[in-house]
Amino acid sequence: MNEVTIYTDGGCSGNPGPGGWGVVVIFNGEAKQLSGGEKNTTNNRMELTAAINALSIVKNTKEFSGLPVKINIDSQYVKNGITVWIKNWKLKGWKTADKKPVKNQDLWIQLDELNSALDVSWNWVKGHAGIEYNEICDQLCQKEIAKNR
């Protein structure tokens, strides 16, 4: 069975500061790139935005309907948030273990909706370790940061 493979990255210059994100979607040996950015944001918001945009592409592409998705991400924050922490955040009214509001709740809600609608497996990859598509995502991210300075 076919699978959609995704790599994502996000970051910024200064935190907060100008930020960018990059995505590579791979299907049937073809890799498509997507990127974007913001003038004033945080690393975590850009990591989340990358994942949201990647999964939105999958959800809205008829050819990908019903296929499993493997998302490779170098952000432990996003991987742990969507696979572990989010269940308790929702049960506790979007509060953390120490009863503080969850940061980036708006983005977590979007990511959760997409993750729930698709068959997604989340895989952490080490950033800046020479993994080809992760490096491409980083380059896309850096170009967007430069555009938003």
Question: Each predicted region: which residue ranges?
Answer:
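RNase H-like nuclease fold core
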Residues: 1-45, 56-59, 67, 139-149
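RNase H catalytic domain
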Residues: 11-15, 52-136, 140, 144-145
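Short, conserved alpha-helix that lines the donor NDP-sugar binding/gating region
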Residues: 47, 51
